[in-house]
Amino acid sequence: MYTMAVVYGVFFSCFGPSVKYIFFMEGVHMFKQYEMELAGRTLRVDIGRVCAQANGAALMHYGDTVVLSTATASKEPREGIDFFPLSVEYEEKMYAAGKIPGGFNKREGKASENAILTSRVIDRPMRPLFPKDYRNDVTLNNMVMSVDENCRPELLAMIGSAIATSISDIPFDGPCATTQIGMIDGEFIVNPSQAQWQDGDLQLTVASTKQKVIMIEAGANEIPEDKMIEAIYKAHDINQTIIAFIDKIVAEVGKEKHSYVSCAVPAEMFETMKQVVSPEEMEVAVFTDDKQTREKNIDAVTEKMKEAFADNEEWLAVLGEAVYQYQKKTVRKMILKDHKRPDGRAINQIRPLAAEVDIIPRVHGSAMFTRGQTPVSYTHLRAHETLA
């Protein structure tokens, strides 16, 4: 069936749009389209057109930019982990810009730096909206199929990921939406073109839910603080219109969220943990200025609890998360009540700073900057004038 689909795909692509319309008029494949006006252009979402076996899929159109966003989840939770296994992919294809990879190898290369950073930007607002105790593998994949320089595909992938996940049966406390704001000559530009994004004084990306802003990423020249705040509020307001649009799609084609095996820490487990290791003992374990000593203390606390819960497999499975939450509550109490951090610093006190220069011979310049227990080494090398 897959081979036949590929053959038909090549056939129809050769004959252009006229054959495509006949193909869909025959009723072979039905899908739904949704449209909204966004920053003076039409945002179109095709649901059910492709990827029928994914938990959720949306074919996004904005100008001539096209991005396929899918959300898939494993049927069973991954065993032996204490985190949510989410993977986000953003795939750039040369054909999307009408180009063919050059050189001897005509295949696509590895992910670019922009693709990796875009994947992270998609991940940041999405990850907190999944249940913390969800252990099924989830993959959000975004494939750029066509690029219009006036409509940035990164933005489309962010919105597409939210739509694909929201209409899927994967547990998700969304939707969320993303807007980009640029600024040229003091005027805001909503969802700017690639040239406006690069040449403007502001590069602001804001992700929101209905209730609040959940992610801000920005690069800018020097601009007034009130301008930045105004841009954030403007993006948040636009996000609300996108969220209303997503809600409409979910109401019509959204799937019922499936149930899952919760890996949350039982409330009674916390009470028992306090009997094994008292809050005062946990404070002593956490309160040290040496990170390695603190980690050894926490390991000792964990081992003590393992011995106490040796007969309870359910509690042992979530022990790592339970100890982390216990430690987190202890640190929070120390900061709010005693105004001290775990290493003894006051809340307004920075770590010790140190700087050295000329630490490496045979290079034109070198330096080492240390903050607390974290050193960073820098080197500078100037090429020979014959290589200029």
Where are these regions (language model features)?
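Mobile "lid/hinge" segments at catalytic clefts and subdomain interfaces of large enzymes
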Residues: P171-E281
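Alpha/propeptide regions of enzymes that mature by internal proteolysis
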Residues: F31, N55, F83, G109-F130, ...
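Conserved phosphate/anionic-ligand binding catalytic regions in large, soluble enzymes, centered on
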Residues: R152-T165, D169, D358-S377
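Conserved small/polar residues in nucleotide/adenosyl-binding loops
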Residues: T379-A388
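Glycine- and acidic-rich phosphate- and metal-coordinating loops
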Residues: P101-F104, D123, D133-V147, M215-E217
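Noncatalytic alpha-helical scaffolds and linker/capping helices
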Residues: F270-E356, I360
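Flexible, glycine/charged-enriched surface loops at secondary-structure junctions
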Residues: K132-V138, D173-P175, I242-Y260, Q292, ...
